[in-house]
Amino acid sequence: MQPVSVDTVHAPTRELHGGVTIRHPVLVTLVSLELVLLAVQFVLGMFVDLYVTFPSPVFGMYGLMQLMFQPGMGAVMAHMMTGMVLGALTLLTFAAAALSRNTLLIATTGGTFAAVVAAGISGMEFLFSGQNNAYSYGMSLGFLAAFALAFLSLLVAYGRGR
């Protein structure tokens, strides 16, 4: 049995055809999934923005239950649930990056997690503030930051950055 070096444990690599080596294959998979979910989140958010009409923020006797039975709220719920899954995935990716001990990966995945959380908080504030456009803008900035940082994380995990 051969001894396992620290480099093998903390920076696994995978050789592809053509001599391309992936430095962190697990992180490449996780960040790729993040990017796919961010794209789904964008499409759902645009649908909600264009086609869902929100009622007044003053809730009646049944409060939020009445709000959820409005037309188009299924898309809002899908948007919210995708955001929660995305938040959990970015936290998992951040933890995996911390195990890799790569400072740049830790910074980019941590930034992605922070951007997703900021976008989610802005989304909740948007929903409960009477659709204040500042919170909608906050969601869009959070999305842009998360997408850019996730793409940068993918490049670093792939071995293109140091």
Regions from the PLM with identified roles:
Residues 2-162:
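Polytopic transmembrane helical bundles with strong interfacial aromatic enrichment
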